[in-house]
């Protein structure tokens, strides 16, 4: 049974660009354990496509625009070391990028990357659970939850385990007050760029990811000190200025979205059971890695819950 408030605070999963990418494009290095996480993610989303009868995954190439000569040289060196992931553009791709973008230091091609149709996934999965009688759309009230080491009772629902997947709100959960939660907010713009080809992801100091037809997700920023989740107008103006310098095409801002990310000190994932209350588990702290690392971590947690001898993914809980 899933309990989820339908109209709560903005969820980071809704604001996310939802991209699976094996390469850290800023450092030009491979993401740690990328083969393990990506294999599990692709298998999970393909299985969900079959279950839901919709398309959720789309393989793409990412064009990485170099900001300076140092970054260009770094990518040229890495291309020789990582030819399966970093390539030169074809003549047709060079012509395409020159038509739509201004660029001084060249471009590398990273791929494949996978775009997840996050909005469709979340909506379809919610409907699937609801039709199965497995979704309770209300605010969870922990005061009404009776939790014992061997069982959990919430209103009329009896269970052996409760898994808290609260995102940024997890830092206020008394069971996990000693975990190293930190605050981080991110925001993105939804842009209308009708003539920009939607078969690619474009990365500069900001990233453009195809969304709905003619629309692109543009983001994202990271802010560690904040008092609210209101759109940052200064960031928006700076981003629009960067877009005007980078894009040769006109664009229009359709929306400006903000959400608080569930992050931890050291960017450590939290997936495991409470050391003193084995019926209580947590799945949190994935930050910007939720769509890419979440499936593998969730599978590990499920194995641990059904067989406690199986290790959990988070060292912070044990």
Locations of regions flagged by a protein language model:
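A short, glycine/Asx- and small/polar-enriched loop/turn
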Residues: 103, 147-153, 157-158, 263-268, ...
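Central helical "cap/lid" subdomain
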Residues: 152-202, 223, 229-232, 246-251
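C-terminal catalytic lobe of FAD-dependent flavoproteins
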Residues: 252-318
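Helical element adjacent to the flavin cofactor pocket in flavoenzyme catalytic cores
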Residues: 108-161, 165
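Glycine-rich FAD pyrophosphate-binding loop
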Residues: 1-14
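Dinucleotide-binding Rossmann-like beta1-alpha1 core, especially the glycine-rich loop
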Residues: 18-99
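Flavin-binding catalytic cores
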Residues: 194-196, 213-215, 223-266, 273-277
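Short beta-strand to alpha-helix junction loop
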Residues: 28-40, 108-124, 230-234, 292
């Amino acid at each position: 049974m899933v309990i989820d408030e339908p109209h709560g605070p903005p969820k980071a999963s809704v604001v996310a660009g939802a991209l699976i990418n094996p390469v850290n494009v800023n450092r030009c290095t491979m993401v740690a354990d990328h083969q393990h996480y990506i294999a599990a993610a692709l298998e999970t989303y393909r299985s969900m496509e079959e279950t839901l009868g919709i398309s959720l995954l789309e393989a793409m190439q990412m064009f990485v625009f170099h900001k300076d000569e140092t970054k260009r040289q770094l990518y040229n060196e890495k291309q020789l070391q990582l030819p399966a992931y970093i390539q030169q553009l074809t003549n047709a791709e060079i012509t395409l990028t020159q038509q739509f973008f201004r660029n001084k230091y060249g471009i590398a091609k990273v791929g494949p990357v996978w775009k997840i149709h996050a909005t469709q996934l979340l909506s379809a999965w919610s409907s699937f659970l609801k039709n199965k009688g497995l979704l309770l759309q209300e605010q969870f009230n922990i005061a009404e939850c009776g939790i014992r080491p061997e069982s959990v009772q919430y209103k009329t629902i009896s269970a052996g385990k409760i898994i808290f997947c609260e995102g940024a709100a997890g830092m206020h959960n008394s069971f996990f007050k000693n975990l190293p939660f930190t605050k981080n907010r991110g925001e993105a713009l939804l842009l209308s760029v009708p003539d920009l080809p939607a078969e690619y992801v474009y990365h500069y100091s900001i990233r453009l990811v195809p969304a709905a037809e003619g629309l692109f997700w543009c983001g994202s920023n990271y802010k560690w000190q904040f008092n609210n989740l209101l759109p940052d107008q200064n960031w928006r103006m700076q981003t629009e200025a960067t877009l005007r310098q980078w894009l040769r095409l006109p664009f229009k801002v359709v929306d400006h979205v903000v959400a608080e990310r569930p992050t931890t000190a050291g960017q450590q994932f939290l997936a495991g059971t409470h050391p003193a209350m084995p019926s209580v588990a947590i799945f949190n702290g994935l930050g910007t890695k939720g769509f890419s690392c979440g499936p593998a971590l969730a599978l590990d947690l499920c194995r641990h819950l059904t067989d406690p001898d199986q290790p959990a993914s988070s060292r912070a809980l044990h």
